[in-house]
Amino acid sequence: MSMRIMVVEDDALIALDIVGLLEDLGHEVVAEAADAFTAWELAEGDTPDLALVDIRLARNTDGGKLAQQLYDRLGVRSLFVSGSITDDFREAMAAINPVGFIGKPVTRRSLGDALAACA
């Protein structure tokens, strides 16, 4: 199942890699943002099926708070991608029913498996 996905990642090279992987897997990347403020504005304008979100974002914004807002206000679930996912973070995010958590570096297999689980 092809999904419309928003990528929220502050590292441009990692974002580029993730976008390429998503497109290779047959998904449409409908928006890209490096910070939570921009991501929220983009999601309000064109709500994605899923948000792929880093935990620490540009402009000192918080990916966890963004994911909570996306879920509470727009019903958009998130797939977290980060090099610093802790058990405490997983527990804090449990209420928003995330698709999953992927560590960096992201591979085609880890991303494909996580996305297949939410189809």
Predicted regions and their residues:
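Short amphipathic alpha-helix used as the core "switch/output" element in two-component signaling
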Residues: 64-76
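Acidic, metal-coordinating helix/loop segments flanking the phosphotransfer/catalytic sites
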Residues: 19, 32-50
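C-terminal output helix
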Residues: 88, 106-118
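Active-site residues of response regulator receiver
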Residues: 54-55
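As written
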Residues: 92-102
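Two-component/phosphorelay signaling modules centered on CheY-like receiver
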Residues: 12-31
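Hydrophobic/aromatic residues positioned on beta-strands within the core alpha/beta folds
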Residues: 81-82
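Conserved acidic carboxylate
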Residues: 9
